[in-house]
Amino acid sequence: MGKYYCDYCDVFLVSESPSVRKAHNSGRNHLTNVRDYYSSLGHDKAQSYIDEITRMFETGGGNSTSNRGPGGNPPGSQPGPPNAGMSGPMRPPFSNSTAGPNMPPLPPAMLALMNGQNGMSSPGSGPPPMRFAGPPIPNNMPPGMMQPPHVNGYSSGPLPPQPQPASGGQGAPPLTARMNPDRARQLG
């Protein structure tokens, strides 16, 4: 039996995957059940639910402990643990002080590399850090990071080749330097 229960339809979904929930929530029967539920509440009660949900999103989440039916504990059921399902995304088992309040913590291998360690750890502490092949990057930049452009608009290294004027003394149009040579010949 699936772990996702739809209060509006009074059914357990077969799978707990987001795609199954999305398909269920966009289904004709579910939409009809939602419409019927809120129309049976009356305008004032439905508007109070909408306002409460809007307030929760504006304040960054939170948990209303009121027993409100769909979205909360079903009427007549026993309440679950505080903040069950409403506390936001689950945090990974590792945590550190380098992550900001809205940033996920860094994995231990990344912390080891940032602290200058070689990334080797004791058995059972997780996979070794990824190693990147290739030539060393100037300015001690980490692999995969682009270097900032210089004043002339190019990154470090030699300047790109400049277009040479044709032997007849005429200069090539400026776009030919970026154009395929065959295409440039066709254009004349």
From Swiss-Prot:
Compositional bias per record (Pro residues), positions renumbered to this chain: 72-82, 125-141
Stretches assigned to coiled coil: none
Zinc finger feature spans (Matrin-type): 4-36
Keywords: Metal-binding, Nucleus, Ribonucleoprotein, RNA-binding, Zinc, Zinc-finger
One Pfam short name: zf-U1
Composition skew (Low complexity), residue ranges: 109-124
GO BP term (any one): spliceosomal snRNP assembly
Region (Disordered): 57-188
Location (main, coarse): nucleus
InterPro entries: Matrin/U1-C_Znf_C2H2, Matrin/U1-like-C_Znf_C2H2, U1-CZ_Znf_C2H2, U1_snRNP-C, Znf_C2H2_sf
Entry's Gene Ontology cellular component terms: commitment complex; U1 snRNP; U2-type prespliceosome
A GO MF label: zinc ion binding
PROSITE patterns in the record: ZF_MATRIN (PS50171)
Top-level taxon in the UniProt lineage: Eukaryota
Subcellular location: Nucleus
Protein role: Component of the spliceosomal U1 snRNP, which is essential for recognition of the pre-mRNA 5' splice-site and the subsequent assembly of the spliceosome. U1-C is directly involved in initial 5' splice-site recognition for both constitutive and regulated alternative splicing. The interaction with the 5' splice-site seems to precede base-pairing between the pre-mRNA and the U1 snRNA. Stimulates commitment or early (E) complex formation by stabilizing the base pairing of the 5' end of the U1 snRNA and the 5' splice-site region.
Quaternary structure, from the entry: U1 snRNP is composed of the 7 core Sm proteins B/B', D1, D2, D3, E, F and G that assemble in a heptameric protein ring on the Sm site of the small nuclear RNA to form the core snRNP, and at least 3 U1 snRNP-specific proteins U1-70K, U1-A and U1-C. U1-C interacts with U1 snRNA and the 5' splice-site region of the pre-mRNA.
Assigned protein family: Belongs to the U1 small nuclear ribonucleoprotein C family.
Protein name per its UniProtKB record: U1 small nuclear ribonucleoprotein C-2
